[in-house]
Amino acid sequence: MASQAHSLSYSGCNFLRQRLVLSTLSGRPVKIRKIRARDDNPGLRDFEASFIRLLDKVTNGSRIEINQTGTTLYYQPGLLYGGSMEHDCSVLRGIGYYLESLLCLAPFMKHPLRIVLRGVTNDQVDPSVDVLKATALPLLKQFGIDGESFELKVVRRGMPPGGGGEVFFSCPVRKVLKPIQLIDPGKIKRIRGMAYSVRVSPQMANRIVDSARSILNKFIPDIYIYTDHMKGINSGKSPGFGLSLVAETTNGTFLSAELASNPQGQGAAMLPEDLGRNCARLLLEEIYRGGCVDSTNQSLALLLMTLGQQDVSKVLLGPLSPYTIEFLRHLKSFFQIMFKIETKPCGEELKGGDKVLMTCVGIGFSNLSKTLK
């Protein structure tokens, strides 16, 4: 058993998920102090406690110690076990908050993961399940994580503040990951989207589609935005509507943007026309930033490159988000790995923002739980 002396120490509540996920994969214990120590309501929030409970479910033999006020957390990771399970997520954050971390851990379980998550499927803070399905799953497939049992499905939609959504996620396990070379994003060839509405008029979704198309039609003809109006028990507990858009390039890169309406009873009411137009503009901004991986999945791509075989992996990204920059620092702490970062200024033929080429040699991470057959 690793003693607390070998553990990594951090302070503050920021990047809690990053630290716990990397701790689980590297096997290094982590101690986090001063979690909102000066706050009027100190310690871990409900959604963070729920995340720790989820980690406890998917691992076997984890040791978690939290002090009385919840301001200090000691986490000694166990083995990633997987299997079939259910988890009730906190409605304070979206299911995407939990799913992002499961996408990092799922390929390295002992048994294939099959999990039902309940809570908020679409909110204004976390990536929605629709966007993760359209962007993160194709990215995992590039690394060789694929198969019939690789699935992410929205069974019920749930909007904040009530939630009531349900998502099914299953992922096969892999012993090793393939190195990747994603250096040419290609040109945008089609845009797909999903306009959803729950517990409001189904006409809302159609109005969102019309306003989004009014902007996007100027650039490309191949646009199709589905409308999804769930009824009855499948519509969750709160009213709301929103839009997620995904642009696909000729080389199989996916760039996404999304917007959701204000939660019931919070903020001003939002017109579906405004939401559609703003979401279309966000997608154009994401396309301008560009790269082979969109800004939501930058850290997932870098993690899978780190854990790949001992071979060179390269990926071209748009400007790094602050979350990704901190993730690179954590990768250095937990895995002693550093990336070669080259800036690629936008040339004449490459319209859009400046790009960053990230290169690393994988650590040859092997799923020890997975026996060779």
From Swiss-Prot:
Coiled-coil intervals: none
Keyword Nucleus attached: yes
Principal localisation: nucleus
Example GO biological process: ribosomal small subunit biogenesis
InterPro entries named in the record: RNA3'-term_phos_cycl_insert, RNA3'_phos_cyclase_dom, RNA3'_phos_cyclase_dom_sf, RNA3'_term_phos_cyc, RNA3'_term_phos_cyc_type_2, RNA3'_term_phos_cycl-like_CS, RNA3'P_cycl/enolpyr_Trfase_a/b, RPTC_insert
Top-level taxonomic group: Eukaryota
Keywords recorded for this protein, A-Z: Nucleus, Ribosome biogenesis
Pfam families according to UniProt: RTC, RTC_insert
Subcellular locations according to the entry: Nucleus, Nucleolus
Classification via SUPFAM superfamilies: EPT/RTPC-like (SSF55205)
Cellular component, GO, one term: nucleolus
GO MF: RNA endonuclease activity
Family affiliation: Belongs to the RNA 3'-terminal cyclase family. Type 2 subfamily.
Purpose of the protein: As part of the small subunit (SSU) processome, it plays a role in 40S-ribosomal-subunit biogenesis in the early pre-rRNA processing steps at sites A0, A1 and A2 that are required for proper maturation of the 18S RNA. Activates BMS1 by promoting GDP/GTP exchange. Does not have cyclase activity.
NCBIfam families: 18S_RNA_Rcl1p (TIGR03400)
Record text on subunit structure and interactions: Part of the small subunit (SSU) processome, composed of more than 70 proteins and the RNA chaperone small nucleolar RNA (snoRNA) U3. Interacts with BMS1.
Name by which UniProt lists this protein: RNA 3'-terminal phosphate cyclase-like protein
Native source species: Bos taurus
GN (gene name): RCL1
